[in-house]
Amino acid sequence: MTRPLIQLALDSLDAGQTLKLASQAAPFVDIFEIGTPCIKHNGISIVRDLKTRFPNKLLLVDLKTMDAGEYEATPFYAAGADICTVLGVSGSATIAGVVKAAQAHDAEVQVDLINVPDKLACAREAARLGAQIVGVHTGLDAQAAGQTPYADLQAVSRLGLPVRLSVAGGVNQSTVTQVKKAGADIIVVGAAIYGAPAPDVAAREIRELADGNHHQFIMSKLSGVLASTDRSHEARLTAMLEGSRRIFVTGAGRSGLIAKFFAMRLMHGGYDVYVVGEIVTPSIRQGDLFIVISGSGETETMLAFTKRAREMGARIVLISTKGSSTIGDLADLTLQVGTPEQYKKTVGMPMGTTFELSTLLMLEATVAHLIHAKKIPEEQMRTRHANLE
């Protein structure tokens, strides 16, 4: 099971207290929820304040929209909301309106199943309409009557819908593991944190209980990206390598480190390979292959290099998170690693690490493919490895 996200419900009417609590819990939570009472009392300004102070946190605005979905949600997405909620009981037209508003701002929608009689049917409809999150929610009044969300969570989880499941309703330290096992992708915590004597300590405890094994989480995320990557990439890239006179590789930042790793492995395989930017790298010519690693496909320095390589007649391969981009328009072949949705900040691995690590694994698989195809003995590869270290 992947690492669930922790969502903190900020329900205070006092904006100052809301910001203070957010600061205390920030190191341990992934999503700040501006609760319905808070957003009604403070208005859209609280969205802007939280987004300014915590730009790297996801921001959910619990609008509980009941009508006029697109019209109501649009200004909140424009102000910085990453997710807005719409009530499942509102009906398909209203949900579709919020989905439309979210799509216009590259954001997400959560459909709240609170008070929905047929939760399974509503969850299916939410997924069909394009919502990314379904919220299994037992409200405060229902909690007071002894109700919990756990049975409903398990039932919705068994549907296997292409959505993330959020659970809210009395979650605390004693129930975090239970809701995680029941299938929650997002665990919403309110009073267990904001009602604790030390909110930061409570948030850390819940974070630790939810996390489990970090190694398992990272492996699960990378496996998911590679599973959604076209398996023909290795063979297609190998064909490009085999048809080239020389190979030039490049990338910015961490992508550059991956490019250097790939260059070393190609050298082991007997290829004439160079890293762009090194003082000994020669000029690129027709018949050469230029491989650029850029997650966005828009990196300015990489774009300039790509244009020059195109002018000189080199063939170009882009490795990216996107199937279409400015650099991709210049490339002979674009190898998309995973899907764009897997690189949103909801994935739980910060600062873009998922792309770099996944690309590293894909390129290592390419090396394994070409070594097998060319029947290169490992002993021969070892003779090419650096011996001045």
Question: What label would you give each PLM region?
Answer:
Residues K40-K64, V98-N115, Q147-Q173, E205-A210:
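Alpha-helix-loop-beta-strand connector modules within alpha/beta enzyme cores
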